[in-house]
Amino acid sequence: MFGTATSANATRVLLLGSGELGKEVAIECQRLGLEVIACDRYADAPAMQVAHRSYVLDMLDGKALEEIINKEQPAYVVPEIEAIATDKLVDLEEKGLNVVPTAKATKLTMNREGIRRLAAEELDLSTSPYRFADNYDDFKAAVEHVGIPCVVKPVMSSSGKGQSVIKTEDDIEKAWDYAQEGGRTGAGRVIVEGFIDFDYEITLLTVRAVDGVHFCAPIGHRQEDGDYRESWQPQAMSENAIKAAEYTAEKVVNALSGYGIFGVELFVKGDKVIFNEVSPRPHDTGMVTMISQEMSEFALHVRAFTGMPINKIVQYGPSASAVILGQGTSTDIRFDNLAKALAQPQTQVRLFGKPEIDGRRRLGVVLTRRKTIEESVQDAVENAKKVKIVY
């Protein structure tokens, strides 16, 4: 049963993280008359612009987080980012707080170590070879064990921050320094991953709901500098590869438990899949579902965590997303040439409303639906380039 937003009987949703993904979750909550409270470390974040009210805080501060939760008494706490005081959420969940999908899932996936150990050591899923390191000497030993080339990532980071590839021994020290600069909570533990041979990588959006586990069509994507640039759906896969991907994803989400959508990242080689990572929330590559599906990943997430059935996920056909990427320094961001970007049918633009930029930042996305994946991706990329960012 839902109450009415802003009334005494309101059903409240507290968003922890208010970026572009949180913004779409907030909009889907609004469609159901839920009262949305958005939190982030900076003011005027995208989800705050469509929420009933908002708070600015360091979400790694457990005391500050608990104060807001006690004040707002939310029916659902919905994390959108990794950098949250997860130990506090675990404590509060034991006292009755409803964390989406669960506080355990949020804590385990907060860093790459928890989820990698779950997948490889508890669930016995295929992963790349890996080692963890806390200091430079252990890091060098980890690189030697895994072998060159290898990938280095902070155990806690997002959007490719702190991630690099070691191709020669000359890269080792630089990779360590870069990882120490890029972690969400500052310097610390890293994962060294061995290179694996794969044909392509996918995100398998997997919904755990009251009526079972459901799968979206696989999403292919292209990464650059550790961050996605384009995604498309459906990614062509063999029947055996799809079965293997769904088996792996279902095993992971059932181990994490709770209701909601999970972005399961997999490498695919022929009919074989290798587990990479999972996010217990909507995934950035899944923004393509805003044009490719009857229910976007955000609508599916809200429907699932509020205890409603999913029934059937309908996919409309070849679709793509391409990032509108800004680079500069400004608190006065404007966009021009939108009419040119929208000149073709079945094309949409989403501008995130980020209030500032300092360096490189994802500011929007172009969505397309065409007769083929190739056309969809090409048109999405070309139309994204037409959007002129004025700083």
Swiss-Prot record:
Annotated positions binding N(1)-(5-phospho-beta-D-ribosyl)glycinamide: E20, L21, E80, D284, K354, R361, R362
Positions contributing to ATP binding: R112, K153, S158, S159, G160, K161, G162, Q163, E193, G194, F195, I196, E201
Record's GO cellular component terms: cytosol
Annotated residues for binding of Mg(2+): E265, E277
Keyword Kinase in record: no
Keywords: ATP-binding, Ligase, Magnesium, Metal-binding, Nucleotide-binding, Purine biosynthesis
Pathway recorded for this protein: Purine metabolism; IMP biosynthesis via de novo pathway; N(2)-formyl-N(1)-(5-phospho-D-ribosyl)glycinamide from N(1)-(5-phospho-D-ribosyl)glycinamide (formate route): step 1/1
Coiled-coil zones: none
UniProt-listed GO biological process terms: 'de novo' IMP biosynthetic process
Source organism, top-level taxon: Bacteria
Keyword NAD belongs to the record: no
Domain ATP-grasp as annotated: residue spans: 117-306
Molecular function in Gene Ontology: ATP binding; magnesium ion binding; phosphoribosylglycinamide formyltransferase 2 activity; phosphoribosylglycinamide formyltransferase activity
PROSITE patterns linked: ATP_GRASP
EC number: 6.3.1.21
Function: Involved in the de novo purine biosynthesis. Catalyzes the transfer of formate to 5-phospho-ribosyl-glycinamide (GAR), producing 5-phospho-ribosyl-N-formylglycinamide (FGAR). Formate is provided by PurU via hydrolysis of 10-formyl-tetrahydrofolate.
NCBIfam families from the UniProt entry: PRK09288.1 (NF006766), purT (TIGR01142)
HAMAP family linked: PurT (MF_01643)
Quaternary assembly: Homodimer.
Family: Belongs to the PurK/PurT family.
Protein's name in the database: Formate-dependent phosphoribosylglycinamide formyltransferase
Species of the source: Vibrio parahaemolyticus serotype O3:K6 (strain RIMD 2210633)
